[in-house]
């Protein structure tokens, strides 16, 4: 559980935009473009930060 607290740190950067809705169209468009199918299935995890930390983290940067 403590590990999950460390994940939110990088996820916080995309959270305000990606989870809020304002940045959803931007990151959402990159997900399917980068990995069509893989990101679609993990679309939820991507925003959660579990799988997204690898794709969304560096991508948003």
UniProtKB/Swiss-Prot annotation:
Biased composition (Basic residues): 1-14
Organismal lineage: Bacteria, Pseudomonadati, Pseudomonadota, Gammaproteobacteria, Aeromonadales
Region of interest called Disordered, as start-end residue ranges on this chain: 1-61
Species annotation: Aeromonas sobria
Protein name: Aerolysin regulatory protein
Source superkingdom: Bacteria
Segments of skewed composition (Polar residues): 51-61
Functional description taken from the UniProt entry: Regulation of the expression of aerolysin.
């Amino acid at each position: 559980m403590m590990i999950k607290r460390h994940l939110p740190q990088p996820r916080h950067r995309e959270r305000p935009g990606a989870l809020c809705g304002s940045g959803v169209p931007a990151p959402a468009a990159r997900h399917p473009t980068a990995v069509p199918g893989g990101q679609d299935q993990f679309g939820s995890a991507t925003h959660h930060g579990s799988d997204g930390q690898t794709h969304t983290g560096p991508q948003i940067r």
